């Protein structure tokens, strides 16, 4: 009984305290973000347009990088599978030769 009580207290006491501590320090930031204060993009104008253009350029560049990485991955896969096909074809030929040798010997 004493052992299980210690285990329960250790499990819930320590973890419960950490949960309470982390919950106590967290602020609800959704209230402060609703005002949009300081957001250049929401203000509109030249700065908002410039920021949108920079974001668009960034995402186009990231998409281009991802497509290049995907293209390289597929090329590597094709190369790997081509080599695997060649290896398997050589095995098939080797087995066919063994079968032919067995037929010739008997």
From Swiss-Prot:
Gene3D superfamilies: Single helix bin. It comes from the Eukaryota. Residues 48-58 have a biased composition (Basic and acidic residues). Residues 60-106 form a coiled coil. It is found in: Mitochondrion. Residues 74-106 are annotated as: Antiparallel alpha-helical coiled coil region. Keywords: Coiled coil, Mitochondrion, Phosphoprotein, Transit peptide. InterPro entries: ATPase_inhibitor_mt. Residues 26-52 are annotated as: N-terminal inhibitory region. PANTHER family: ATP SYNTHASE F1 SUBUNIT EPSILON (PTHR48417:SF1). Forms an alpha-helical dimer with monomers associated via an antiparallel alpha-helical coiled coil composed of residues 74-106, leaving each N-terminal inhibitory region (residues 26-52) accessible for interaction with an F1 catalytic domain. The inhibitory N-terminal region (residues 26-52) binds the alpha(ADP-bound)-beta(ADP-bound) (ATP5F1A-ATP5F1B) interface of F1-ATPase, and also contact the central gamma subunit (ATP5F1C). Belongs to the ATPase inhibitor family. This is ATPase inhibitor, mitochondrial. It comes from Mus musculus. The gene is Atp5if1.
């Amino acid at each position: 009984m004493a052992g299980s009580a210690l285990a329960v207290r250790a499990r819930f006491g320590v973890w419960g305290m950490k949960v309470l501590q982390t919950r106590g320090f967290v602020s609800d930031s959704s209230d402060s973000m609703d005002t949009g204060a300081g957001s250049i993009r929401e203000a509109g104008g030249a700065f908002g347009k410039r920021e949108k253009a920079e974001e668009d350029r960034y995402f186009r560049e990231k998409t281009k990088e991802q497509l290049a990485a995907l293209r390289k991955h597929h090329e590597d896969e094709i190369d790997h599978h081509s080599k695997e096909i060649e290896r398997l074809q050589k095995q098939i030929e080797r087995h066919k030769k063994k079968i032919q040798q067995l037929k010739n010997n008997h």
